[in-house]
C-alpha cells in the first residue's frame, strides 16, 4: 500500500492514536537501544505482548513498520515520518509544560493528550510563536 504525500490527518485516520503511540515508542526505543523487539515495546508501554502483536501487524499492513527475520522492528520511511512528528509535538509540549511549572510526570501525560488534539496548523503557529519569543529574548 503506497501512502506517500498523505497529510498527518490522513495518517491519524489510518492508524489512530494507539498506532501513533506504538510508532513513537518504537522511535524512542530505537534511539535508546538501537534494535527493538515487540517485547521491548510491551515493557515500555506496559501492555501485553498479544496487544503489541496486533498493533505490529496492523502497522506492518499499513506500511509503517517492518519486522526482520530476527523479529526486530524497523520503521519504514512513512512510519519514521509519523513517529518523528508525534515525538516532536510530545517533546515540545512536555518542555513547555515543565517550564510553566507542571510536574514532569503530569507534563508527560498531558503532552500525550495535547499532541493528538492539536491540528497541524495550530501546532505550527504555536511553535512559530514560541520560537519568535525565544529569539526576542
Please give the residue ranges for each predicted region:
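N-terminal helix-turn-helix DNA-binding core of bacterial DNA-binding proteins
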Residues: 14-47
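Short, Lys/Arg-enriched N-terminal segment that forms or immediately precedes the first helix
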Residues: 1-14
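Arg/Lys-rich, alpha-helical DNA-contact motif
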Residues: 87-121
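Basic, amphipathic "hinge/linker" alpha-helix immediately C-terminal to the N-terminal HTH DNA-binding motif
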Residues: 71-89
Amino acid at each position: 500500500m503506497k501512502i506517500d504525500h498523505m497529510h498527518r490527518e490522513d495518517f491519524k485516520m489510518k492508524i489512530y492514536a494507539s498506532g501513533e503511540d506504538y510508532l513513537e515508542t518504537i522511535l524512542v526505543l530505537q534511539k535508546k537501544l538501537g534494535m527493538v523487539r515487540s517485547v521491548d515495546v510491551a515493557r515500555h508501554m506496559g501492555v501485553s505482548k498479544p496487544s503489541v502483536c496486533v498493533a505490529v501487524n496492523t502497522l506492518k499492513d499499513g506500511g509503517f513498520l517492518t519486522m526482520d527475520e530476527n523479529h526486530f522492528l524497523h520503521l519504514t520511511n512513512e512510519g519514521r515520518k509519523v513517529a518523528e512528528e508525534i515525538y516532536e509535538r510530545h517533546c515540545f509540549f512536555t518542555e513547555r509544560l515543565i517550564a510553566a511549572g507542571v510536574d514532569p510526570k503530569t507534563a508527560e501525560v498531558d503532552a500525550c493528550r495535547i499532541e493528538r488534539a492539536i491540528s497541524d496548523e495550530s501546532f505550527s503557529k504555536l511553535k512559530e510563536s514560541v520560537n519568535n519569543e525565544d529569539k526576542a529574548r
